[in-house]
Amino acid sequence: MGPVHRIFSSFARARRNGARWAPFQIADKPSPSGGFLFFNGVMLKTPMPTQHELEMVTLEELVPKDHLLRQIDAAVDFEFIRAKVAHLYCADNGRPALDPVVMFKLLFIGYLFGVRSERQLMREVQVNVAYRWFARFRLTDKVPDASTFSQNRRRRFTDTTVYQEIFDEIVRQAIKRGLVDGRVLYTDSTHLKANANKGKFDVVKLEQTPAAYTEALNAAVDADRAAHGRKPLDRDDDEPPSSKDTKLSRTDPDSGYMVRDDKPKGFFYLDHRTVDAKHAIITDTHVTPASVHDSQPYLDRLDRQRERFEFKVEAVGLDAGYFTPAVCQGLEERGIAGVMGYRTPNHKPGMFYKRQFKYDAYRNEYVCPQGQALPYSTTNRLGYREYKSNAQICGRCPVRSQCTNSAIAVKVVTRHVWERAKERVDARRLTEWGQRIYARRKQTVERSFADAKQLHGHRYARMRGLRKVAEQCLLAAAAQNIKKIAMLLARKRKKGPAGPDWRFVRMLLRLVSGLRCSFDYPLAANPQS
């Protein structure tokens, strides 16, 4: 019978005998390490203060063998950081600086364990032996001042690409370990609440930045108009760009005011993140104000990954926010199969749906539900072909009220010059292959964001300004990658359920059940490619 069980048995025996709680008694001869209490014959030990005793101990003994930081230290090489930042330090002048490897290790500790402020991080390092072990501090070493991070950020790393380079090198280490293959990528965005009061703003006119695909769209519009015998559109390069009224935060002007369905209103940033399908390693993160649409930076960031990491991308999984003509066309031009979600378009009750107007590609016209043709009229600057009905026929139509409210009785149906690419992407979504690809989104990029928000402080922007928030997102993503690399490699080293034999059994089960992972399917299996 154990000591705890004996204690509770004594309590029960005393209650059965009709006794209330019996008083504790101090033993006559306490040991040097503490006194003794007796209750119904059971001895309880009371500890004596031992804080000032000397012990022979090492940090290596105090850190558990299965601690996350031990796994990270064994799996990830941080020495590259010193070479990345060497040109930013003076070798023969000034006081000795904090080792940059140690500094970034401390920052990674903060993101790994959700420590929100650098001041609190230093308090944690002061008392946590695992943190000291990881940073190579002795028990009696003085930890750096919290201002060390802010001063390096402000004086040394401003206007540099150090954070991006460190993130990229972590990804390269994952590639070398075989944890990333770059065949199937998933991209999404999440919002971070800016460190700004949503009630303090000015309404200003901001110029609209031309989209990255503007030149390609203009060329497609001119080619389409020429094919239909129309003149090219006049474009005045000296014409000032369009502008619109926008809420500008007084506290953090770099943030953007977000107005989206089912999203909070206020000043936010967007973290556009891409993960690899194999093990959900983050391969890219890019920060914009929340007023920027998800699709705008997508193709540029995709090209950057293909160039930087030499990815041979075969397919991408995206949500409905990326289902735009420009993205669909861009993916086709790059030979990448896109699988995207579908969003029901806005529809006025009582009116015909656009899908009820059938497109006749041979005659290049639409046919209305009443069987009347809407021939091609023109192609506008936004890249949309306009198909217009005959006003005389529509004026006598019995269902005109369900078709158009036009005062001149003309129904206009639009079709983008890149609409065919959208239709192929949408058809791919409905195939069995496309459904398997899309189903993996929730296990990859959505799970990555969930972990970031729940465990790594990704709900709020810690600092103000686009550059500093980008630093936060890069370090948080790098910390998540470091953690995943370490855990995956530790799992491979460990024998048992995660060993090779069990993986083989799981693969057989997937083959039998038809639940094989999406990245196991080559592009040739895609019937729509």
Regions found by a protein language model. Name each.
Residues F8-F11, F24, F36-F39, F519:
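Aromatic (phenylalanine/tyrosine) cluster motif
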Residues F39-N40, K45-T46, G114-V127, F137-S529:
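Anion-binding and metal-coordination hotspots
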Residues G41-R70:
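Hydrophobic alpha-helical membrane-insertion signals
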Residues K65-F108, F113:
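Basic, short loop/linker segments at the boundary and entry of helix-turn-helix/winged-helix-like folds
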